[in-house]
Amino acid sequence: MENIQFDSGIRTYRINGEGVLRFNPGDPNVYARFLEAVEKLKAAEEELTRQAETAKETQIVELMTQADRKMKGILDWVFGGDNDFGAILKGVNLLAVADNGERVSTKLFATMEPVLVEGAKRC
């Protein structure tokens, strides 16, 4: 079998010195999914908040775990199937709070947004 190789624009990013994320930052499909994901992730957090209001204290952790799985699935969809955000983030829950008081999901999106905006400008 012969092999055909070309530059597809795929770039590799090391996340927090550990996990590896691969995608084409200049792909308008990735940017469109990223914008859509912002709303989907907000909706997942709002759903968690609603569920937590009536949940027993012992159920809160399970609700957060379910929301984390859902949110990581959204991120896997945004950046492509070869990326596994459970592995990329080394198991950290996206709803965890960073040292500055912001959620990990908020920090991740704030960090990725400029990369995607710059890529979208090249299209």
Residue ranges: model-predicted function:
Residues 10, 19, 27-30, 71, ...:
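Low-complexity, compositionally biased segments
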Residues 59-66, 96-99:
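Short coil/turn segments at secondary-structure boundaries
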Residues 77, 82-123:
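C-terminal charged interaction modules
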